[in-house]
């Protein structure tokens, strides 16, 4: 690797705010916030909304179920215009 062109790779604490879960992962992410971890060391800190702890694919749970499809929504919105017969 060429020296001086690659970002610093280090451990970063990610906080999944939707389920209040913390985990440490190696990353090149740059942040000004820090947090003291369980091992007593200070790491960069970054908040996220979705991770493997909260994503429906990994948890097997659906959060929001869409009641209508896009076509049904379109038909409902534009039904008032009726159909034109030529």
Curated annotation (Swiss-Prot):
The protein's name: Large ribosomal subunit protein bL31B
Record key words, sorted: Ribonucleoprotein, Ribosomal protein
Alphabetical GO biological process terms: translation
Key word Ribonucleoprotein present: yes
Species, as recorded: Vibrio vulnificus (strain CMCP6)
Self-association state and partner proteins as the record states: Part of the 50S ribosomal subunit.
Pfam short name (any one): Ribosomal_L31
Any GO CC annotation of this UniProt entry: ribonucleoprotein complex
MF terms (GO), sorted A to Z: structural constituent of ribosome
Recorded superkingdom: Bacteria
Family: Belongs to the bacterial ribosomal protein bL31 family. Type B subfamily.
């Amino acid at each position: 690797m060429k020296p001086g062109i690659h970002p610093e790779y280090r451990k970063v604490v990610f906080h999944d705010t939707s389920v209040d879960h913390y985990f440490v992962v190696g990353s090149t992410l740059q942040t000004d916030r820090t947090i003291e971890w369980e091992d007593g060391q200070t790491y960069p800190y970054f908040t996220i909304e979705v991770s493997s702890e909260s994503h429906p694919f990994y948890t097997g749970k659906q959060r929001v179920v869409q009641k209508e499809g896009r076509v049904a929504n379109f038909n409902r919105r534009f039904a008032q215009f009726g159909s034109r017969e030529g």
